[in-house]
A protein has these predicted regions:
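Acyl-donor-binding surface of acyltransferase catalytic domains
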Residues: 1-143
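Conserved GNAT acetyl-CoA-binding A-motif
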Residues: 66, 211-223
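Short hydrophobic/aromatic beta-strand or adjacent loop that forms the aromatic wall/cage
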Residues: 116-120, 159, 244
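Short, conserved active-site entrance elements at the starts or edges of catalytic domains
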Residues: 137-162
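A conserved beta-strand-loop-helix scaffold within acyl/acetyltransferase catalytic domains
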Residues: 153-160, 165-166, 170-183, 188-191
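Residue-level detector of high-confidence beta-strand sites
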Residues: 173, 241-243
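Conserved acetyl-CoA-binding loop-helix of GNAT-fold acetyltransferases
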Residues: 186, 196-210, 230-235
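Conserved beta-strand-loop-alpha-helix junction that forms the acyl-donor binding cleft
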Residues: 220-234, 239, 247-248
Length: 248
């Protein structure tokens, strides 16, 4: 038996997909006074790593661009000009039309060391939360001591956290991999022996409902090649609102 959790559409502030992508970019990175990306925005500062030199978020409503702090001003202007000339997005899964030009501009400054991208999702208005999911707190964090020892040590940083428990141990968890004032992004993991049983979808739904109940927007993203993670999004009923490309 599942219970319906979440806000009615009428309770949500008017926002298009480009606005939502902007909130996601603001949530996923830290910034300097110029609005340039510095580091990834994990709740635990020790887990943060240097931001890419370029984040391009694409939606049917328009683009969102963030440039890394290491990029010279002239390069930042060049990247933004290239993206401004892109045609409207017709297929989110297709590479950006300007990808080759962006690579060339970045490579003139420094070699490209990493490239990534994938879909970004929002949660539906009503989120069904399976009753078997357990919220992790200080009182029961022993559930992750053996299976997720890093989470046992850092539980307070990654809240809210939810788990599916088998034989007294957490076998799947969802936590806040990024956390901001307006939104949070899901991080999900299932032990290999327990994959393919719907546990990841269950904990993700519970996490999304909790973030929404806190007055923030729950978000989920993954890489195009991560078919298992995209499958979780389908099972939870998440709605793809955009896609991103990152170049470091």
């Amino acid at each position: 038996m599942c219970r319906s959790l979440g806000l009615d559409e009428g309770d949500l502030a008017p926002m298009d997909d480009r606005d939502l992508m902007g909130i996601r970019a603001d949530t996923d990175f830290t910034y300097d006074a110029r609005g340039r990306m510095l580091r990834s925005n994990e709740p635990c500062e020790e887990a943060r790593r240097p931001a890419p030199r370029l984040f391009l978020g694409r939606t049917m409503a328009g683009h969102v661009v963030r440039v890394g702090a290491s990029a010279p001003d002239a390069l930042a202007r060049r990247l933004e000009a290239i993206i401004d000339r892109q045609p409207p997005v017709g297929d989110l899964q297709a590479p950006p039309a300007a990808l080759a030009a962006l690579r060339e501009a970045l490579a003139r400054h420094a070699p490209i060391t990493a490239e990534g991208g994938g879909p970004a999702y929002r949660f539906p208005a009503s989120i069904a939360q399976p009753g078997e999911v357990v919220q992790l707190t200080d009182a029961n964090r022993a559930l992750v001591r053996e299976t997720y020892p890093w989470l046992y040590d850092e539980l307070a940083d990654w809240q809210p956290c939810f788990a599916v428990v088998r034989d007294g141990e957490a076998v799947a968890v969802c936590f806040s991999s990024r956390s901001g004032a307006d939104a949070a992004e899901a991080g999900v993991d299932t032990l290999p022996a327990f994959r393919g049983r719907g546990h990841a979808a269950a904990v993700t739904a519970a996490w999304g409902a909790a973030i929404r109940a806190s007055g923030r927007i729950p978000l989920y993203s993954t890489a195009w090649e991560n078919l298992a993670s995209r499958g979780v999004a389908r099972r939870v009923g998440l709605i793809r609102f955009g896609a991103d490309t990152t170049l470091a």
